[in-house]
Regions:
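Histone-fold recognition with a strong bias for associated Lys/Arg-rich disordered tails
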Residues: 1-156
């Protein structure tokens, strides 16, 4: 599945792994993925989240409050939580529904929103974001912008 990721989506995944290791977490959870999407900075997901008033510092603070810190890890965690794996599956499905043959940051965010019960969704709600409303707004936006040929895996 990673082979279909855009450069920005791969970068967001890398940031997710880095923040998990920095926080001393031995896994990559949806909360780390949310942080990575925002930290990436220029993808559709980052722009949407920034438009909702989110910052990487706000997400980091929420992660620390909800989960805490462990010992900083020298190696990046390899394991994705089952919920994060589910989010990736949902991201792929949402991309296909829209007619995209790649996974961009926008699809990763849609996967988080679609899954609906993760730590990432709790963080969004704690920061005043309505995940269901955001999901529907994003789907509408992406359907309006969906290229007929399925898009390019280098853009988002």
């Amino acid at each position: 599945m990673y082979g279909r990721f855009t450069e920005k989506a791969e970068k967001a995944m890398k940031f997710s792994q880095e923040i998990a290791a920095e926080l001393g977490h031995s896994y990559v959870g949806t909360e780390h993925l949310l942080y990575g999407l925002l930290k990436e900075g220029s993808g559709i997901a980052a722009r949407v989240l920034q438009g909702q008033g989110m910052t990487d510092d706000k997400i980091l603070k929420q992660i620390e409050e909800l989960i805490g810190r462990g010992e900083k890890m020298k190696e990046q965690p390899l394991g994705l939580t089952p919920r994060t794996k589910r989010v990736l599956e949902l991201s792929f499905r949402e991309a296909r529904k829209i007619g995209h043959n790649y996974i961009g940051t926008e699809h990763l965010l849609l996967g988080i929103l679609k899954e609906g019960e993760s730590v990432a969704v709790r963080i969004m709600m704690d920061l005043g974001i309505d995940p269901q409303k955001l999901f529907h707004e994003m789907v509408k936006m992406l359907n309006e912008e969906a290229p007929s040929a399925g898009g390019s895996p280098k853009t988002s």
